[in-house]
């Protein structure tokens, strides 16, 4: 059963207003709250989806964890395996060397990170080896100086399978004429497509033995790339991987460390968007204050009569708090329903407008993906609803308190 104050407050909310403008302001405030809640849910859902998709893309092309010697005193990469063997959660490990270089072909030059790999082991730690547009990892034959390029890099260089490209390394050769760059011809034997624009435009792989020759290494490796059963558990697993006594000679890092700056930037953007869009709800709550103040002014005679019948100032305050709170509740409810429905279907909505207008809004060269992902988090929805209801409740305090201070004699003097 509703209390008297709640019953009167709901009756005031449903009653036809004598002042049409006041009714309009009330509807605007409810619509404003609904719009703010909808926008906040949709934006956070898109950012959640974007973060989830990019995390999935990165985990397909990047190692889940890496391990290596700090000073490279031990040149046998198999000795590193003792840290990973019989470890629950580690599925595979592959050695690698890595260094910077320039690739040149047909007058085009691009900066790249050349990775020396062991084909039989590399296939075990990355997903894209089975979906190469041309060639395969096993085409990298030691001593042949073969190279596999990302599709974007190959396109930028104008290189195709079978072409030779020139690799220019940072280390130079000392000649009587001075120091000149070291040049080496490599044959393109394959193309790889990871789906991540940045990787596809900078990735170059060769056999680990050829990479050692190119960079004048002995038997050193940069480290091991690891594939984990549960990448989300990478920080906890890597923290226990190296014994305390050997942490000054062996380093280990996981994918969250390697991509920390990116994910921190996305998380910061999410927080800032949350704050900015919450202001929309706050502005709508201020409209709720205006509508309640006007309602208090219109109901002065009613308030005075209720007071003379024995209703306490606190009871009067509750009436208008109920009226305002239910306005906020209806706005929040409408916003949650619209936000969740739109959040679930925002990809289809964007695709519809792209087809209708003949434009492509999501550029994969900028955003890694060419569609708008969405992941509605019910925890975010609950938080947004609570904030909206809280702001709506706060908005009722001043008008309700003002109504409670109404003096019956003053209010009825001119009635």
From Swiss-Prot:
Matching InterPro entries: ABC3_permease_C, Lipoprotein-release_system, LolCE_TM, MacB_PCD
Transmembrane found in the keyword field: yes
Compartments where found: Cell inner membrane
Main location as per UniProt: membrane
Gene Ontology BP, a term: lipoprotein localization to outer membrane
Protein name, entry field: Lipoprotein-releasing system transmembrane protein LolC
NCBIfam families, alphabetized: lolCE
Family to which this protein belongs: Belongs to the ABC-4 integral membrane protein family. LolC/E subfamily.
UniProt function note: Part of an ATP-dependent transport system responsible for the release of lipoproteins targeted to the outer membrane from the inner membrane. Such a release is dependent of the sorting-signal (absence of an Asp at position 2 of the mature lipoprotein) and of LolA.
Membrane-traversing stretches: 24-44, 273-293, 324-344, 378-398
Alphabetic keyword roster: Cell inner membrane, Cell membrane, Membrane, Transmembrane, Transmembrane helix, Transport
Membrane topology: Multi-pass membrane protein
Entry-linked PANTHER family: LIPOPROTEIN-RELEASING SYSTEM TRANSMEMBRANE PROTEIN LOLE (PTHR30489:SF0)
One Gene Ontology cellular component annotation held by this UniProt entry: plasma membrane protein complex
Superkingdom of the source species: Bacteria
């Amino acid at each position: 059963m509703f209390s008297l104050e709640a019953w009167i407050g709901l009756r005031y909310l449903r009653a036809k207003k004598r002042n049409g403008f006041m009714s309009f302001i009330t509807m605007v405030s409810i619509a404003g709250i609904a719009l703010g809640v909808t926008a906040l849910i949709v934006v956070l859902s898109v950012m959640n989806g974007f973060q989830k998709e990019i995390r999935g893309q990165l985990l397909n092309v990047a190692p889940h964890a890496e391990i290596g010697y700090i000073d490279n005193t031990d040149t046998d990469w198999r000795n590193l395996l003792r840290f990973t063997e019989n470890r629950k959660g580690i599925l595979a490990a592959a050695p690698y060397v890595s260094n910077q270089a320039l690739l040149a072909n047909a007058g085009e030059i691009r900066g790249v990170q050349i990775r020396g790999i062991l084909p039989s082991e590399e296939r075990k730690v990355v997903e894209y080896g089975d979906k190469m547009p041309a060639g395969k990892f096993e085409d990298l034959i030691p001593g042949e100086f073969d190279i596999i390029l990302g599709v974007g890099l190959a396109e930028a260089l104008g290189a195709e399978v079978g072409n030779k490209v020139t690799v220019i390394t940072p280390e130079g050769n000392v000649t009587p004429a001075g120091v000149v760059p070291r040049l080496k011809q490599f044959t393109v034997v394959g193309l790889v497509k990871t789906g991540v624009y940045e990787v596809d435009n900078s990735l170059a792989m060769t056999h680990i033995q050829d990479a050692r020759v190119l960079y004048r290494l002995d038997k050193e490796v940069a480290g091991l790339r690891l594939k984990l059963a549960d990448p989300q558990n990478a920080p906890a697993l890597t923290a226990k991987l190296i014994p305390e006594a050997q942490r000054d000679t062996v380093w280990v890092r996981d994918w969250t460390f390697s991509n920390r700056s990116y994910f921190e930037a996305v998380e910061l953007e999410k927080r800032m968007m949350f704050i900015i869009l919450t202001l929309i709800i706050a502005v709508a709550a201020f409209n709720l204050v205006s509508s309640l103040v006007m309602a208090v002014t219109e109901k002065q005679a009613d308030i005075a009569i209720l007071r003379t019948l024995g209703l306490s100032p606190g009871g009067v305050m509750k009436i208008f708090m109920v009226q305002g709170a239910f306005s906020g509740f209806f706005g929040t409810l409408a916003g949650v329903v619209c936000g969740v429905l739109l959040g679930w279907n925002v990809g289809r909505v964007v695709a519809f407008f792209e087809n209708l207008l003949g434009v492509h809004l999501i550029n994969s060269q900028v955003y890694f993906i060419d569609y708008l992902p969405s992941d509605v988090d019910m925890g975010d929805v609950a938080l947004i609803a609570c904030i909206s209801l809280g702001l709506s409740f706060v908005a009722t305090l001043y008008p309700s308190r003002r109504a409670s201070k109404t003096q019956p004699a003053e209010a009825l003097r001119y009635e």
